[in-house]
Amino acid sequence: MKQFLDFLPLVVFFAFYKLYDIYAATTALIVATAIVLIYTWIRYRKVEKMALITFVLVAVFGGLTVFFHNDEFIKWKVTVIYGLFAGALLFSQWVMNKPLIQRMLGKEITLPQEVWSRLNIAWAVFFILCGLANIYIAFWMPQNIWVNFKVFGLTALTLIFTLLSGVYIYKHMPQDDKH
């Protein structure tokens, strides 16, 4: 259910884009993200920081897109979010000396420190590359290509990278934890 809720605003954005235009889609994205956030709070009495940050960025960049009738703002939102994620991962590793990935998964999974560090850096690089790809596609390709990339391309890339991360984690888990 949680994963469905996370993807619902993206589905709403895509549907409204196909039915109307980027501005209706952006308005629908803001509303859908707010509804999911409120529902999550009511249902679980907790909202993850990432969901809150995403909502704020959707509201700000989406609001600017609709207000100025300029789709460049919503296109930048994707890169800004990925940049923040990459920055948080790198900050956690180099300044806080404990990879954010380890903070998120370390209670459930036991891995050597160097594996946590590699995984953390890999995700940071992934987010940086996705952000750069978004800039290229958003500003040098037609709008419909960008929407498809945002909805399907980035989602597929994230799922593939998550699966590859899972394989990498499994490969480095202690034998007794694999059962």
Swiss-Prot record:
Taxonomic lineage of the native organism: Bacteria, Pseudomonadati, Pseudomonadota, Gammaproteobacteria, Enterobacterales
Membrane topology listed for this record: Multi-pass membrane protein
Family per record: Belongs to the YciB family.
Organism this protein belongs to: Enterobacter sp. (strain 638)
Alphabetical keyword list: Cell inner membrane, Cell membrane, Membrane, Transmembrane, Transmembrane helix
InterPro entries, alphabetized: YciB
Role played: Plays a role in cell envelope biogenesis, maintenance of cell envelope integrity and membrane homeostasis.
Keyword Transmembrane helix: yes
Protein encoded by which gene: yciB
Annotated transmembrane regions: 22-42, 50-70, 76-96, 121-141, 149-169
Protein name as catalogued: Inner membrane-spanning protein YciB
One Pfam family this sequence matches: IspA
Principal localisation: membrane
Any one cellular-component term (Gene Ontology): plasma membrane
Compartment(s) where it occurs, according to its Swiss-Prot or TrEMBL record: Cell inner membrane
HAMAP family membership: YciB
